[in-house]
Amino acid sequence: MKITIQHIDLFPTRIWLFDLSGLSEHYPVWQSALDQLRRENPTAAGRSNRNGWNSDKIIAANPLFASLVEAANQAFIHALLQTDPNVNYSFKLELWANIHDQGGYNMFHVHQNVLL
């Protein structure tokens, strides 16, 4: 029996990688802030995190994370311009923290109505 095999690239996926190691000086401050936030709000916000904790979507509003927010905005602008440089995209970041305890993970899920 002869089997003909071919492939069609219908769903190409580009993955952008951004090196944020330049922000590493902020990591200890961010970790302390998130640990404090978890102590103050021990009940996880829910969503897909299992065996751990996640915050509400409040991280972007915290001035301690301003450099991370700026880097994320720049990254999304870069990606969106590669998608189509002739479109003036508008977006708003929602940032939250996921902290996984030993054995923790995120459930498989999708984000409806998102571009990237």
Question: Where are these predicted regions, by residue range?
Answer:
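A short coil-to-beta-strand element that immediately follows conserved catalytic motifs
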Residues: D84-L95
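Non-heme Fe(II)/2-oxoglutarate
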Residues: M1-P85, Y105
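A generic structural micro-feature
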Residues: L10, V87-Y89, H109-V114
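Catalytic core of non-heme Fe(II) oxygenases with the double-stranded beta-helix
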Residues: E94-L116
